[in-house]
Regions:
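Glycine-rich "substrate-gating" loop/helix at the edge of Rossmann-like oxidoreductase active sites
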Residues: 84-94, 114-126
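Active-site "gating" loop of Rossmann-like NAD(P)-dependent oxidoreductase/epimerase domains
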Residues: 34-55, 69-76
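A conserved pocket-lining segment of Rossmann-fold NAD(P)-dependent short-chain dehydrogenase/reductase
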Residues: 102-123, 135
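Mid/C-terminal beta-alpha module of Rossmann-like enzyme folds, strongest
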Residues: 131-194, 209, 214, 220-224, ...
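A short helix->loop->beta-strand "cap" motif at the edges of active sites that frequently abuts
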Residues: 21-28, 75-76
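Conserved beta-loop-beta element that borders a ligand/cofactor-binding pocket
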Residues: 33, 65-90
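NAD(P)H-binding glycine-rich loop region in Rossmannoid oxidoreductase-like domains
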Residues: 1-24
C-alpha cells in the first residue's frame, strides 16, 4: 500500500517488462485495477476517461496510458485486463476481504468503509484468473482493454444479510465514517494510505463487463452466494456443530 513505492518503482518495473517482452517476442497481459477512473457513480467501461487524483491513481493512469501507446507498436502484443475490487479465498488481499469477510471468519465485528448502502462491484479472484487465461489464449483479444467479468453489484448490507442466512447467525458490523478515517489517518500510516481510495465508497460502483460477457457467453461467473459457500465452508461446519 506504500504510495512512495508505487511512485518510485512501478513505472520503472513496467518499462522493464515492456522491453523484456519486445526482446523475447513475448505477449504482455497486464492485470490492472480501476484506480484511474473517476470516483463517482458513473458507469465504468473499457474506454472510460481517466480522471484521477492521488499518487496511486496517477501512477496507475500513467501505466495504463503507457500500455495503450504500446498497443500501436507492431513489435509487441499488449492486453490490459482490468478488474474492480477483489474478494476471494485463502490470502486474497483487499479492503472488503480484510474488513468484512476475514473479520466475520474470526468472530469479529465487520468494519464497513463509509456506507452500507452504496453498491459495490466485486470480482471473485478465481474468476479473474480464469478470465485472464481465457483472454490470453485467443488470437483476437490483444491490443485492447478488457473488463473482467463480475457478478451483480450489491450493497454491503445485502452482502451481510446473505452471510447471515448462510451462517445461521447475526453478523455484527459497524460503518466507519469519513471523519473516523480522517482522524485515524493522523496516527496510522495504513489509514493514510487508504484515504485516497475512500471516495469510491461514497458512491455506487458500476463496473461494466458486458464486452467480455458478449465475447464469452459461456463463461461461468461465480455468484456471490456460491462464493460465500467457498469462503465460509469451514465456519459453516463449526456453526453447525455449535447449534447441536
Amino acid at each position: 500500500m506504500d504510495s512512495e513505492q508505487w511512485k518510485t518503482k512501478f513505472e520503472i518495473m513496467l518499462e522493464n517488462v515492456i522491453q523484456a517482452c519486445k526482446e523475447t517476442k513475448a505477449k504482455l497481459v497486464f492485470f490492472d485495477n480501476t484506480y484511474m477512473y473517476e470516483k463517482n457513480d458513473t458507469e465504468q467501461f473499457e474506454d472510460s476517461k481517466f480522471i484521477y487524483d492521488g499518487i496511486k491513481s496517477t501512477v496507475r493512469a500513467k501505466m495504463a496510458d503507457r500500455l495503450v501507446t504500446e498497443m500501436e507498436n507492431p513489435d509487441i502484443d499488449v492486453m490490459i485486463c482490468r478488474a474492480p475490487e477483489f474478494y476471494g479465498p485463502n490470502k486474497t488481499q483487499s479492503i472488503t476481504n480484510s474488513l468484512l469477510f476475514n473479520r466475520v471468519k474470526n468472530d469479529k465485528t465487520a468494519l464497513l468503509p463509509i456506507s452500507d448502502q452504496t453498491l459495490r462491484t466485486l470480482i471473485w479472484t478465481p474468476d479473474a484468473s480464469k478470465a485472464m487465461a481465457l483472454l490470453a489464449n485467443q488470437p483476437d483479444t490483444y491490443n485492447q482493454t478488457w473488463h473482467l467479468p463480475c457478478d451483480v453489484s450489491r450493497t454491503y448490507e445485502e452482502m451481510i444479510k446473505l452471510m447471515e442466512e448462510k451462517l445461521h447467525k447475526p453478523v455484527k458490523y459497524k460503518v466507519i465514517k469519513q471523519w473516523m478515517f480522517d482522524l485515524g489517518s493522523i496516527f496510522n500510516k495504513n489509514m493514510q494510505e487508504l484515504k485516497e481510495l475512500l471516495p469510491r465508497y461514497h458512491y455506487d460502483n458500476k463496473f461494466n463487463s458486458d464486452k467480455f460477457k458478449k465475447k464469452f457467453p459461456d463463461f461461468e461467473i461465480t455468484t456471490f452466494s456460491n462464493a460465500l459457500d467457498d469462503l465460509f465452508k469451514l465456519e459453516k461446519k463449526y456453526y453447525s456443530r455449535k447449534k447441536r
